[in-house]
A protein has these predicted regions:
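Catalytic strand-loop segment that frames the active site of acyl-thioester-processing enzymes
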Residues: 1-35
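Active-site helix/loop of acyl-thioester processing domains in fatty-acid/polyketide metabolism
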Residues: 38-56
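HotDog/MaoC-like acyl-thioester-processing domains
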Residues: 12, 79-100
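Beta-strand secondary-structure signal
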Residues: 18, 75-77, 84
Length: 100
């Protein structure tokens, strides 16, 4: 429900997927926050589950280093051996998740 039309996949590899977020008119951005829209942190996890066909049951660690705004391109990279997923923008880490 939250993810409908939120992003488009622009590149897909075995361990990495690049997406482009929708504009500020998407309901996710309208709710968080109307005058300064940012992507809610929990939505990253929903995107990761959908992109990599995962069922995340435990979040061991989550680190966010900056905000994500509409229209940005994000790259999610998964390291299956360590259960770590990185989210980067222009090669700069913006979020890191350790899951199981």
């Amino acid at each position: 429900m939250f993810l409908t039309n939120l992003y488009n996949i622009t590149k897909k590899e075995a361990d990495a997927i690049v997406i482009e977020l929708s504009d500020k008119n998407h309901p996710v951005f309208q709710a968080h926050f109307p005058n300064k829209p940012i992507l809610p942190g929990f939505i990253h996890l929903d995107i990761i589950e959908e992109l990599f066909d995962l069922d995340i049951s435990i979040i061991k660690k989550a680190k966010f280093t900056t905000f994500v705004v509409p229209r940005e391109r994000l790259k999610y990279t998964i390291n299956d051996k360590k259960n770590i997923i990185l989210c980067t923008r222009d090669e700069q880490e913006i979020a890191r998740f350790q899951i199981s």
